[in-house]
């Protein structure tokens, strides 16, 4: 459970960092860029710890996919970006893809079970 919390923190940090990048580009000052740097760095640190117990493909798909989903939604709400039918179709496809990757991941087989199975 702890590693899933780390993954959630990585996703939240990535969303915040990416939105800060956009905010920095439309406002004056360096605060947005500093926040972006800190949050993206934290995102990678949290992700690197999360993949110790979560399959890399699953963790990365969730990290990137959920990030894209929320960044797109917040960009529409905060920065008045357009949300076309094509973008919506892409986001729906993304959600289904993440669900397929998550459901298709098996837990690693215990080394002792492998040795017993190989000996038989």
UniProtKB/Swiss-Prot annotation:
Keywords: Cell inner membrane, Cell membrane, Membrane, Transmembrane, Transmembrane helix, Transport. It is a multi-pass membrane protein. One of its GO terms (cellular component) is plasma membrane. Its main location: membrane. GO terms for biological process: glycine betaine transport. Gene3D superfamilies: 1.10.3730.20. Coiled coil: none annotated. It is found in: Cell inner membrane. It comes from the Bacteria. The chain crosses the membrane at residues 1-21, 31-51, 54-74, 81-101. One of its GO terms (molecular function) is spermidine transmembrane transporter activity. SUPFAM superfamilies: Multidrug resistance efflux transporter EmrE. It holds the Pfam family Multi_Drug_Res. InterPro entries: Small_drug/metabolite_transptr, Small_multidrug_res, Spermidine_export_MdtJ. NCBIfam families: PRK10452.1 (NF007767). PANTHER family: SMR FAMILY PROTON-DEPENDENT DRUG EFFLUX TRANSPORTER SUGE (PTHR30561), SPERMIDINE EXPORT PROTEIN MDTJ (PTHR30561:SF2). Catalyzes the excretion of spermidine. Forms a complex with MdtI. Belongs to the drug/metabolite transporter (DMT) superfamily. Small multidrug resistance (SMR) (TC 2.A.7.1) family. MdtJ subfamily. This is Spermidine export protein MdtJ. It comes from Citrobacter koseri (strain ATCC BAA-895 / CDC 4225-83 / SGSC4696). The lineage of its organism: Bacteria, Pseudomonadati, Pseudomonadota, Gammaproteobacteria, Enterobacterales.
